[in-house]
Amino acid sequence: MARTAHIVRETSESHIDLELNLDGTGKTDIDTSVPFYNHMMTALGKHSLIDLTIHAHGDTDIDVHHTVEDTAIVFGEALKQALGDKKGIRRFADATVPLDEALAKAVVDISGRPYCVCSGEPEGYEFCMIGGHFTGSLVRHVMESIAFHAGICLHMQVLAGRDPHHIAEAEFKALARALRFAVEIDPRVDGVPSTKGAL
């Protein structure tokens, strides 16, 4: 059975059209109308091996927040949909990724219980403007939106870093690598990887 999803979300603030394939090769076609976010979501697709197509636009003349948030919401929903009954998945995964002086660690549990903990960001990171339009605070917001709408537990920890661009990119790549292994089918797993029998 194909582990894919296609979701279109239309509100007065944004239009999001997103497709993904969990069993892809990391092919991406990303246009969110927010250049730095394009860069981050392209990295997420590439390093998770999730084929990802996103065409999004919104009221970015006001602020990029709505488009960024809504894209993350739809990505989370699509991830949940594509996972289906979660039979055979590895479920747990972690990844630590460097980018020059920055180092980020992501730990994922595809548990069906949404939770997100972000820690370790340097003081003032949330106020930094990255790429001209994207604030550091949006990184945490993206992680929370993905986790809660995908129904996963995500711990994201910044272990080192000075450059806000490097920190953000390390976080997205760490999430990508953790998702790559968490969603992967393990041929040794029989059924749902839970003692309860459901996730």
Swiss-Prot record:
Tell me what this protein is called: Imidazoleglycerol-phosphate dehydratase
Please name the Pfam families in this protein's record: IGPD (PF00475)
The protein's matches in SUPFAM superfamilies, at most eight in alphabetical order, are given as: Ribosomal protein S5 domain 2-like
Q: Which gene encodes it?
A: hisB
Q: Which organism is it from?
A: Bifidobacterium longum (strain NCC 2705)
Which one of the record's GO molecular function terms can you name? imidazoleglycerol-phosphate dehydratase activity
**What subcellular compartments does it reside in?**
Cytoplasm
Catalytic reaction annotation: D-erythro-1-(imidazol-4-yl)glycerol 3-phosphate = 3-(imidazol-4-yl)-2-oxopropyl phosphate + H2O
Superkingdom in the source lineage: Bacteria
GO terms under biological process: L-histidine biosynthetic process
Q: Which UniProt keywords apply?
A: Amino-acid biosynthesis, Cytoplasm, Histidine biosynthesis, Lyase
Give the Gene3D superfamilies listed for this entry. Answer: Imidazole glycerol phosphate dehydratase, domain 1
Documented EC number(s): 4.2.1.19
Q: Which GO terms describe its cellular component?
A: cytoplasm
Name the family. Answer: Belongs to the imidazoleglycerol-phosphate dehydratase family.
Q: Pathway listed for it? A: Amino-acid biosynthesis; L-histidine biosynthesis; L-histidine from 5-phospho-alpha-D-ribose 1-diphosphate: step 6/9
